[in-house]
């Protein structure tokens, strides 16, 4: 009897040391998965599209929620550091568009490829880099993913080719990556992203043509967040059906605020490309909460009421949270714990990004030539070490 009472006492004392929310989560029986109806995609030159129902497992749901919250909090921290003048130069934030970067990654393999424009922080994270490396790159520190030399627009990871600052210029590069996949006989695809503001660039249509001629495994993806730098899509494009812009290339228009819609559409598009049918085009209808960049608040060409309406009705994190709670895939308390953990991760990363040293001046000449450069050119050394760059 004494042994039994002692065992019960140990169990109770262990439980009392844990937060009440953790005890509740541990004792609750959650569903392993749930089936959801998702919005049907608009189709162009396709007889069938992605499914209109999908299964979400508890494990995947928790992973997607954590990833989207991490991207959201990371971008808000970048906003704060920029306003403190710790981050300088160009900086384009993607809060509001988390379902795009997380959903696209959920629909492909790690060995697949991705290239995007300058709003790249979220994709850099989903492709496998840490928040520490991203924030340190934003602050120009040695521990950044590009040694502090790339900044907001030029981050890279394995099978992730940036981060490109010239509007639309990454699209032909993406077609070239897809050409390499086909040439090397690999069962891989390249996700080639651009925004609605770049969709009228001539080089994009040239890339469409070559990709279709050579049947390249390229998924062209237009992130339509409704506005270019400060111009609505209706004022910039004669046709806002961006998923039809490929003409001879099949296309999908996808709810880019719903991570499950994005995931299923990406799986469908990737399977299409892997089957040897050639390229496909996806338009993700999404929304950014910040302005085009940190140089503008983003309320001179749209109202604060419009932004708030999207936040209250279509926020991608809120949508996933409601689905998981209502289908017993997670509890409110469990998701709050994730929120707390994410906030701590972001704060720790921000401390690292502000305390890490800046790269030394000699770093300026590294990673330019594939082999040792000819330092002496016409009797001059262009990489002579100065005490200051000013």
UniProtKB/Swiss-Prot annotation:
Q: State one molecular function term (GO).
A: pyruvate dehydrogenase (acetyl-transferring) activity
Instruction: List, alphabetically, the GO terms of the cellular component aspect.
Output: mitochondrial matrix; pyruvate dehydrogenase complex
Q: Does the entry feature the keyword Metal-binding, yes or no?
A: yes
Task: Name the domain of life.
Answer: Eukaryota
InterPro entries xref list: DH_E1, PDH_E1_Alpha_Subunit, Pyrv_DH_E1_asu_subgrp-y, THDP-binding
Q: Where in the cell is it found?
A: Mitochondrion matrix
- Return the PANTHER family for the record: PYRUVATE DEHYDROGENASE E1 COMPONENT SUBUNIT ALPHA, SOMATIC FORM, MITOCHONDRIAL, PYRUVATE DEHYDROGENASE E1 COMPONENT, ALPHA SUBUNIT BACTERIAL AND ORGANELLAR
Name-wise, this protein is Pyruvate dehydrogenase E1 component subunit alpha, somatic form, mitochondrial
Organism encoding this protein: Pan troglodytes (Chimpanzee)
């Amino acid at each position: 009897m004494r042994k039994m009472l002692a065992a019960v006492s140990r169990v109770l004392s262990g439980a009392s040391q844990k937060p009440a929310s953790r005890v509740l989560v541990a004792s609750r029986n959650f569903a392993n998965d749930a089936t959801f109806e998702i919005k049907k995609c608009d189709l162009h030159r396709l007889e069938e599209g992605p499914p209109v129902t999908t299964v979400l497992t508890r494990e995947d749901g928790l992973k997607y929620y954590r990833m989207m919250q991490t991207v959201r909090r990371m971008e808000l921290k970048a906003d704060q550091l920029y306003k403190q003048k710790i981050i300088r130069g160009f900086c384009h934030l993607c809060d509001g568009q988390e379902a795009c970067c997380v959903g696209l990654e959920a629909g492909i393999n790690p060995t697949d490829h991705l290239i995007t424009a300058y709003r790249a922080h979220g994709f850099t994270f989903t492709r496998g880099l840490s928040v520490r490396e991203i924030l340190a790159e934003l602050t120009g520190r040695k521990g950044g993913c590009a040694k502090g030399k790339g900044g907001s627009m030029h981050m890279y990871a394995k099978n992730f080719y940036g981060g490109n600052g010239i509007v639309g210029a990454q699209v032909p590069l993406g077609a070239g990556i897809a050409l390499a996949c086909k040439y090397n006989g690999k069962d891989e695809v390249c996700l080639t992203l651009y925004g609605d503001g770049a969709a009228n660039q001539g080089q994009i249509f040239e890339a469409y043509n070559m990709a279709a001629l050579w049947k390249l495994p390229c998924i062209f993806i237009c992130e339509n967040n409704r506005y270019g730098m400060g111009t609505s899509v209706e004022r910039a494009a004669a046709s806002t059906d961006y998923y039809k812009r490929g003409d001879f290339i099949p296309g999908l228009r996808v709810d880019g605020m719903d991570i499950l819609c994005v995931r299923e559409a990406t799986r469908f598009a990737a399977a299409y490309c892997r089957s040897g049918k050639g390229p496909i085009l996806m338009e993700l209808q999404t929304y950014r909460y910040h302005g085009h960049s940190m140089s503008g608040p983003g309320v001179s060409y749209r109202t604060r009421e419009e932004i708030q309406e999207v936040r209250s009705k279509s926020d991608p994190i809120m949508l996933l949270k409601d689905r998981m709670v209502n289908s017993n895939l997670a509890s409110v308390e469990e998701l709050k714990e994730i929120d707390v953990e994410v906030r701590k991760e972001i704060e720790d990363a921000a401390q690292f990004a502000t305390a890490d040293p800046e790269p030394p001046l000699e770093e300026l000449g590294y990673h330019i030539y594939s082999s040792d450069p000819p330092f002496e050119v016409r009797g001059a050394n262009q990489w002579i070490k100065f005490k200051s760059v000013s």
